[in-house]
UniProtKB/Swiss-Prot annotation:
EC number of this enzyme: 3.1.26.5
Superkingdom: Bacteria
Protein name: Ribonuclease P protein component
InterPro entries in alphabetical order: Ribosomal_Su5_D2-typ_SF (IPR020568), Ribsml_uS5_D2-typ_fold_subgr (IPR014721), RNase_P (IPR000100)
Annotated GO CC locations: ribonuclease P complex
Annotated keywords: Endonuclease, Hydrolase, Nuclease, RNA-binding, tRNA processing
Taxonomic source organism: Photobacterium profundum (strain SS9)
Length: 118
């Protein structure tokens, strides 16, 4: 059975990791969020989050968005290619319900998986 934890090794931790993803990335986006993906040298995907105050004003709103994205990633990690992903929130992301956000993330994860596999 696959382990579904979201451990430290599945996170982008340093500014250098983020910088690499921003420099050369595949993009999948919607009006509510953008996901950038770049292949890594590891055998597992990693996740980074960019949720600016300018886009989602309240701390509880930003935390809620991040929690949902992390949970979606945690559940999909074994289906995703070995890429570094950065999820960037847009203003309208805070208007989505949990279910809508999960569906949108599933669609974007799937699109990026197809892109990276060729």
């Amino acid at each position: 059975m696959n382990k579904l934890a979201f451990s430290r090794e599945l996170r982008l931790l340093t500014p250098e990791h983020y910088k690499k993803v921003f420099q050369q990335a595949h993009r999948a986006g919607s009006p509510h969020l953008t996901i950038l993906a770049r292949p890594n040298d590891l055998n597992h995907p990693r996740l980074g989050l960019a949720v600016p105050k300018k886009q989602i004003k309240t701390a509880p709103g930003r935390n809620h968005f991040k929690r949902i994205v992390r949970e979606s990633f945690r559940l999909k990690q074994h289906d995703l290619p070995a890429n570094d992903f950065v999820v960037i929130a847009k203003k309208s992301a805070s208007e989505l319900s949990n279910e809508e956000l999960f569906k949108l993330l599933d669609k974007l994860w799937h699109r990026l998986s197809r892109l990276s596999r060729g």
